[in-house]
């Protein structure tokens, strides 16, 4: 890579403390079926984003939902609070099919009564990663990694210079690009949206 003058951007992981509820467990239905071969799987998680210039706290929080089979991001929510509403408001934005699996880690929001009742009303099945196995939720984790390495040259510095509204606008723009323009080599260079259209026709 050096001979070609190429530089590979590697984002350093930052440790953040997240509330987990290990007392509530659900079967890992997804079972690393990353391409949704056996079930119609949707994955969700929350990521920490450095606070914009007009927010007086260390982080803001983003919840997102990805479709395993097509890799399309179907909804996201940005909030000042990492609470149940962050996740539940996002789930309500997604038009799920009649039968689906929603996979997550053991974040406290995903074991809350409100969340579990919502998934039941939507006729979905809850799936949870094994404790301490981040790879079980690889698809959404990978998307967050792409977001933080490809959205800006320096994600943290860029975010800290903008307002919360500007951040939300940039996130909308990035996700639109990710879904509609970012081609996936694994799937013959189709975009997530193209794969989603094919999936919906079946």
PLM features: what roles do these ranges have?
Residues 35-74, 80-81:
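An active-site-proximal beta-strand-loop segment
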Residues 6, 35-39, 96-99, 124, ...:
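Generic structural signal for secondary-structure transition and capping sites
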Residues 70-76, 127-129, 153-155:
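Short small-residue beta-strand/loop micro-motif enriched in glycine and branched aliphatics
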